[in-house]
Curated annotation (Swiss-Prot):
One of its GO terms (cellular component) is cytosol. Monomer. Belongs to the protein-tyrosine phosphatase family. Non-receptor class dual specificity subfamily. Dual specificity phosphatase; can dephosphorylate both phosphotyrosine and phosphoserine or phosphothreonine residues. Can dephosphorylate glucokinase (in vitro). Has phosphatase activity with the synthetic substrate 6,8-difluoro-4-methylumbelliferyl phosphate and other in vitro substrates. PANTHER family: DUAL SPECIFICITY PROTEIN PHOSPHATASE 12, DUAL SPECIFICITY PROTEIN PHOSPHATASE 12 FAMILY MEMBER. It catalyses: O-phospho-L-tyrosyl-[protein] + H2O = L-tyrosyl-[protein] + phosphate; O-phospho-L-seryl-[protein] + H2O = L-seryl-[protein] + phosphate; O-phospho-L-threonyl-[protein] + H2O = L-threonyl-[protein] + phosphate. Binds 2 Zn(2+) ions per subunit. The gene is Dusp12. This is Dual specificity protein phosphatase 12.
Length: 339
């Protein structure tokens, strides 16, 4: 039978308890109406009914309920994820947090579970606490571990939650933080990938018209061909040298942040559509202007070091002295070259 434990965190709700269960089957109430557990907690619909749980979020390799299983009124969400550092959990966090929040707002008790109830589900619940209580990753995780001492997410999930914090507890797909994260996830699978995801590439600025807002374009200094927009630049903090992958670091020093990069002699950008043919199937090479073939910079999926010392992985590097920065004024349709 399911054993539901009620933690002492200011909640007066009394959770029902039944006969003792294995550790993996425990469902611990970590916040009012929010439970955290393992696979045994969803072994049968009767267990959930006894605990008053009517919403289940499964973060595992397989869904908790086959099609048509469960019981009437049960809401469920399945997020496919392995308990490995390289698993992309970050991209699913907004959907998970929204599911938990919506269910609780409807007065439902929610169970978040994975297989053992110590890593994947812990990461999701930590993200929910971070967002709803505006806590740092460290504070939210520490609080959860006081309630469920065996909670121990893998280092990859820890890194992803730090990125989640850096983005303000919301996954902004247009932010430099997320773009660099997405590139790193592709790098982990490269060069085995047969095709690069289309969404990995920024739109070629020559294929879209100027928007309603002022914009900054970067053009080939030799032939004036538009190459990329300001939004494609992945700003970074100053560094002191190469470190393997960001999730192996202890802090947020690897997170790309907007800052003063006056000493940097290159722009590190997200790949743009005109680069696609040059990137596929090779680990490194030159980046040439698609119009005049002038050398603009280089790329390396394993990373390159900026002149400021920061190691960027992967790296799509454009030398500043090979491009001009041009501000476009849409109202006048004019362009002004910056000095």
């Amino acid at each position: 039978m399911l054993e539901v434990q009620s933690s002492n965190h200011g909640c007066e709700r009394q959770a029902p308890t039944t006969s003792p269960a294995s550790s993996a089957g425990h469902a611990v109430e970590v916040r009012p109406g929010l439970y955290l557990g393992g696979a045994a907690a969803v072994a049968g619909p009767d267990y959930l009914r006894e605990a008053g749980i009517t919403a289940v979020l499964t973060v595992d390799s397989e869904p908790a309920f086959p099609a048509g299983a469960g019981f009437e009124g049960l809401q469920s969400l399945f997020v496919p994820a392995l308990d490995k550092p390289e698993t992309d959990l970050l991209s699913h966090l907004d959907r998970c947090v929204a599911f938990i929040g919506q269910a609780r707002s409807e007065g439902r008790a929610v169970l978040v579970h994975c297989h053992a109830g110590v890593s994947r589900s812990v990461a999701v619940v930590t993200a929910f606490i971070m967002k709803t209580e505006q806590l740092t990753f460290e504070k939210a995780y520490e609080n959860l571990q006081t309630i469920k001492p065996e909670a121990k997410m893998n280092e990859g999930f820890e890194w992803q939650l730090k990125l989640y914090e850096a983005m303000g507890h919301e996954v902004h797909t247009s932010s430099a933080v997320y773009k660099q994260y997405r590139l790193q996830k592709v790098t982990e699978k490269y060069p085995e990938l047969r095709n690069l995801p289309r969404e990995l590439f920024a739109v070629d600025p020559t294929t879209v018209s100027q928007g309603l807002k002022d914009d900054i374009l970067y053009k080939c200094r030799k032939c004036r061909r538009s190459l990329f927009r300001r939004s494609s630049i992945l700003d970074h903090s100053e560094g002191s040298g190469p470190v393997a992958f960001a999730h192996k670091r202890t802090g947020l020093s690897s997170v790309l942040t907007t800052g003063n990069q006056a000493q940097c002699t290159s722009y590190f950008i997200e790949p743009v559509q005109w680069m696609e043919s040059a990137l596929l199937g090779v680990m490194d090479g030159q980046l040439l202007c698609p119009k005049c073939s002038a050398k603009l910079g280089s790329f390396n999926w394993y990373g390159e070091q900026c002149s400021c010392g920061r190691w960027i992985t992967p790296a799509f590097q454009i030398h500043k002295n090979r491009v001009d920065e041009v501000k476009t004024l849409p109202a006048l349709g004019s362009q002004t070259k910056k000095p």
